[in-house]
Amino acid sequence: MKLGCVLMAWALYLSLGVLWVAQMLLAASFETLQCEGPVCTEESSCHTEDDLTDAREAGFQVKAYTFSEPFHLIVSYDWLILQGPAKPVFEGDLLVLRCQAWQDWPLTQVTFYRDGSALGPPGPNREFSITVVQKADSGHYHCSGIFQSPGPGIPETASVVAITVQELFPAPILRAVPSAEPQAGSPMTLSCQTKLPLQRSAARLLFSFYKDGRIVQSRGLSSEFQIPTASEDHSGSYWCEAATEDNQVWKQSPQLEIRVQGASSSAAPPTLNPAPQKSAAPGTAPEEAPGPLPPPPTPSSEDPGFSSPLGMPDPHLYHQMGLLLKHMQDVRVLLGHLLMELRELSGHRKPGTTKATAE
């Protein structure tokens, strides 16, 4: 009889214990998992074959059924936990961390940490957020707080959670097609190349182009800058910029030097240094000033010296010859003035020479 009573008592005690544990587990946390996204049937699939460029993404579609990406669900029995985002975090995202207490008991003196350093003074706020997260915000986060219930002044610290901020898109690369050294008169295209991850393939980037510190094409959806006819003026240092529509993330490409080949540039006229002329001896008659040079011969199609490879005279050559003849004529005029001055100087010195001889 006593043994039966003892067994019944133990059974009742265990039943009450199981009910209490079950009640605590149910009261601790109640999470709802919801599947969001388009509904796929055998007649219509959620993604085309072109969209499934990655083998990992292609593995989620089997026989016209599309599956969501997996995520890890962690059930914790700690008094205090730090809840982070379930999806990957990219540059420019909003990062929200929540310091969650057991059964949502009230907390005070809540402090958030990254890599062991406090991110602010203690306070009542259980959430910590970064509006525009950057790669530098990656690290190991945790929180601490003091429970106000069930007992006053019970400090607790949550386990560390690793947060990794992924790159939204790499820095763009500026490429020139067909070449960074195009021929003058030929077309050229500058392409600003970068790529978004599959998880953010629906996002849009805006592109702008710069030359020598000046903008040549404002922000737009086109990742190309067209130059229909390249000329010497298009030579210079170019770079491009890719940015999100909200301008939260933007990156520049390295500079690309463009050198247009075959552009004609007018050469500077040659500087003539005339050979020094001997002065006329006193008493000798100076030479008369030379007259103007005869005009250059008229080019003729029969003269091979004036014929270009296409049988037409070269205007650039005529221009250079005209400049040369003009400089030679100026030199002859200067020499004529010099001889006239020497003649006048010798005429002034003759009376003095005669007087000295008479004495």
UniProtKB/Swiss-Prot annotation:
A GO BP entry: immune response
Feature: compositional bias, Pro residues: 289-299
Span list, region Disordered: 259-313
Signal peptide boundaries: 1-27
UniProt KW keywords: Cytoplasm, Differentiation, Disulfide bond, Immunoglobulin domain, Repeat, Signal
Low complexity compositional bias, start-end: 279-288
GO molecular function: transmembrane signaling receptor activity
Disulfide bonds: 99-143, 192-240
Tissue: Expressed specifically in primary and secondary lymphoid tissues like lymph node, spleen and tonsil. Specifically expressed in B-cells with a high level in normal germinal center B-cells, centroblasts and in a subset of diffuse large B-cell lymphomas. Highly expressed in bone marrow B-cells and weakly in earlier B lineage cells. Expressed in pre-germinal and germinal center B-cells in secondary lymphoid tissues. Also expressed in melanoma and melanocytes.
Kinase is among the record's keywords: no
Highest taxon, organism lineage: Eukaryota
Pfam hit, one: Ig_2
GO terms for cellular component: cytoplasm; external side of plasma membrane
Location in or out of the cell: Cytoplasm
Domain Ig-like C2-type residue range list: 70-159, 170-257
Function: May be implicated in B-cell differentiation and lymphomagenesis.
Assembly, per entry: Monomer or homodimer; disulfide-linked.
PANTHER family (alphabetical): FC RECEPTOR-LIKE A, IMMUNOGLOBULIN FC RECEPTOR
Protein name as it appears in the record: Fc receptor-like A
Organism: Homo sapiens (Human)
Name of encoding gene: FCRLA
